[in-house]
Amino acid sequence: MSFFRYLSDISSETRTLLLAYGVLGGLYLILVPLALYWWMNRRWYIMGKIERLFVYGLVFLFFPGLILLSPFLNMRLKGQGET
């Protein structure tokens, strides 16, 4: 039995539910952590106290996605020019 034949046997409600889970999982594990990486890399040295606290909360919330993306992204901050 092929995969597409199996999908056609599933009810439309179940397919909709699987699609919703896939979209939410992609948002949680890929899209929001990428945006968070971008935001932290862009604003690290100019963040205020409240913004930094908010970002740390988001890091805690989206930690699984950040760990998933960490081997592929370089988050080294720019230092003082030391080599």
From Swiss-Prot:
Instruction: For this UniProt record, give its keywords in alphabetical order, as a comma-separated list.
Output: Membrane, NAD, NADP, Organellar chromatophore, Plastid, Plastoquinone, Quinone, Thylakoid, Translocase, Transmembrane, Transmembrane helix
Listed transmembrane segments: 17-37, 53-73
Protein name per Swiss-Prot or TrEMBL: NAD(P)H-quinone oxidoreductase subunit L, organellar chromatophore
Record's catalysed reaction(s) = a plastoquinone + NADH + (n+1) H(+)(in) = a plastoquinol + NAD(+) + n H(+)(out); a plastoquinone + NADPH + (n+1) H(+)(in) = a plastoquinol + NADP(+) + n H(+)(out)
Q: How does it assemble?
A: NDH-1 can be composed of about 15 different subunits; different subcomplexes with different compositions have been identified which probably have different functions.
**Primary residence:** plastid
A Pfam family the protein falls into? NdhL
In terms of superkingdom, the source organism counts as Eukaryota
* InterPro entries with a match to the protein in the record: NADH-quinone_OxRdatse_su_L
Which Enzyme Commission numbers does its entry carry?
7.1.1.-
What functional role does this protein have? Answer: NDH-1 shuttles electrons from an unknown electron donor, via FMN and iron-sulfur (Fe-S) centers, to quinones in the respiratory and/or the photosynthetic chain. The immediate electron acceptor for the enzyme in this species is believed to be plastoquinone. Couples the redox reaction to proton translocation, and thus conserves the redox energy in a proton gradient.
Q: Which residues form a coiled coil?
A: none
Provide any one GO MF term from the record. Answer: oxidoreductase activity, acting on NAD(P)H, quinone or similar compound as acceptor
Please tell me one Gene Ontology term that the record gives under cellular component: plastid
